[in-house]
Amino acid sequence: LTYEQIKQKYEAHSNLYERAIEIIKNNDLIKEFPIYYEVLTDCSERLEQIFKSLLLISEEGKIYSAQILYRAIIELFFKTFFLTSKLSTDKNDESAEHFKVHLMLSEWLAEQMGYLEMTDLINDIENKSDFVQFIRDKFPELKEFDKENQKEISNAIKKFNIKNMIAYIRESLTDKEIGNYFTKILPEYSRASSFVHGGPYATYIVKNLKDKGQIEKELERVVGVAFSCTCVAKENCLLSFKLHPDDMKDFINELREIRKF
């Protein structure tokens, strides 16, 4: 498919999705899993923003930038699919809450760790400062924060490691062919990571694609995969509502039909 055809498909998919959400809101349908709805909606909105940016830079032939956005889409898609899989098996908001609260805290703590390491370097401190004490001193409202809290956060977010998510998805799917498909994306994720981290392998990949005249072909492939990921993530948002099974089936089937290649 050309970029223009993918744009048209995505616009049709988005319009139907918005219509479905509007019907849900107008009928005041219950969010059976409100935290899942919040998390999945947020993820799908971020995916949409990244996908639209990917389309723009791909049309300009910017393969390096496209790979960076592509990697972000793959990771965010895995998170939404993993959360949807957990929802279907657990039937509660626990994993979504871990994502919303514990993962955010973990990311915030990582930022604070960066500040601590920066301070140690600036002040030429030879022995590494105690992180827990650093948090307590800097944020008096967190005076009760201790290593047990750190451990709790760490344990809660282990499930969001990319390999752990893929392993869970693969095991939870009855269709092993689909499960194997997710597993096969791991090398793709790793390859795109070289672009994110500015590795020399990324430079080699770009040079190789240029030499073979395959930049355009690779960009079209990446955009196609990203399109499917973004659409599926939006469809999964509907699963957090109490809908009549037939209504859900009709919406999902029509959305799936639109995104078919």
Q: What residue ranges belong to the model's regions?
A:
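Short, glycine/acidic-rich hinge or "gate" loops at secondary-structure transitions
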Residues: A66, K86-E97, L243-D250
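Residue-level detector of alpha-helical recognition elements and their boundaries
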Residues: A12, K62, L69, S88-T89, ...
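Amphipathic alpha-helical scaffolding segments
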Residues: I68-L76, E97, L209-I215
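Internal, hydrophobic cores of structured domains that mediate oligomerization or house catalytic pockets
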Residues: R71, F77-D120
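Long, hydrophobic/aromatic-enriched structural stretches that serve as scaffold segments
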Residues: E22-S85
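Alpha-helical solenoid scaffolds that mediate protein-protein interactions
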Residues: L54, A66, I73, T80-F81, ...
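Secondary-shell segments that build the walls of catalytic and ion/ligand-binding clefts
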Residues: L1-E32, K100-F261
